[in-house]
UniProtKB/Swiss-Prot annotation:
It holds the Pfam family Ribosomal_S19. GO terms for cellular component: cytosolic small ribosomal subunit. Belongs to the universal ribosomal protein uS19 family. The gene is rps19. Keywords: Ribonucleoprotein, Ribosomal protein, RNA-binding, rRNA-binding. This is Small ribosomal subunit protein uS19.
Length: 144
């Protein structure tokens, strides 16, 4: 018996639900599908900053559907603790990491994660060669 590829297997599903089904759910229904930390965050209610971000997302979605926008603009935000919801899929959100805004293209696989997970706040330090004026410990390195 030959293995048969089915297009349904390629479709994105979150806990057995398609993206279209997720878009029809309200936040309370959606929260039941999320892990405990995200579920608790959503069921406690959104902060004013999170509500403002969600309003911007919905406004841009509405303008895209009406045809007033050709492509979605980048939304800049400091809200790193916002759970990525299905209505954000397809948008680019620039998340502040403490120094700059990192653009994050939202794809379906990101649903249920936090925005801050995709904008790292620290980098791995790569020190230069030891030598004069490199670090305080270079005082003990003999000069040439």
């Amino acid at each position: 018996m030959a293995f048969e590829m089915r297009p349904e297997w390629k479709k994105f599903r979150y806990r057995g639900r398609t993206l279209e089904e997720l878009l029809k759910m309200d936040i309370e229904e959606l929260a039941r599908l999320f892990p405990a930390r995200q579920r608790r965050s959503l069921l406690r209610g959104l902060t004013p900053a999170q509500q403002k971000l969600l309003l911007k997302v919905r406004k841009i979605r509405r303008r895209l559907e009406e045809g007033r926008l050709k492509r979605p603009p980048v939304i800049r935000t400091h809200v790193r603790d916002m759970v990525i919801l299905p209505e954000m899929v397809g948008l680019t959100i620039a998340v502040y990491n403490g120094k700059e805004f990192i653009p994050v293209k939202i794809v379906p696989e990101m649903i249920g994660h936090y925005l801050g997970e995709f904008s790292p706040t620290t980098r791995i330090v790569q020190h230069g060669e030891p030598g004069l004026k490199a670090t305080r410990s270079s005082l003990h390195v003999a000069s040439k």
